[in-house]
Amino acid sequence: VLVQIVVTNAKIKRGDVVYDGNSTLTTPDSGDTSGSRQTLVTGEACRRACLLLRDAMEYRTLEQLIGQEFYGEYYAKTNPLGSSVPNPVSHVAYGYATQMCVVDKETGLIKKMVAAHDVGKAINPLSCEGQIEGGVVMSMGYALTEKYPLDHGKPTAKYGMLGLFRANQIPEIKAIVID
């Protein structure tokens, strides 16, 4: 996703982008990675750095800028849980999702799930569809089949006995990305 953000915002070719994996030595702390949080936080910081690069390319070529660093920063400010401030902010982005299922009346099994999610800007729609499908399967398992027995906070069941859906048990899923 970050490469897509660079190509789109810096207006450079994909072949000119070298992706260097993250390192705690060179990467500032950007909080946890949950859901698509890093697409927002790291992505916005990346976009801001790209705008600086694009401005620099007005006067120099990309080759002349090799070795120069451009920094973008984005801080997703929220209030801690249980905060006493009026109208605390718990999230920096919100979405909306709705699901519909088609059930076989004879067997009681789900034949099809339709999930429509308003996600804001889907940077990688195919990946977004995959996240929706994964969320549907996890939700179905949580609601219908999964059991996670604990004894003093420790799991007591083997992984294969948790009631997770197997691939051949998953119904057709139609993911709709509302951008």
Task: Identify the meaning behind each predicted range.
Residues L2-D179:
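C-terminal catalytic domains of large/alpha subunits in multi-subunit enzymes
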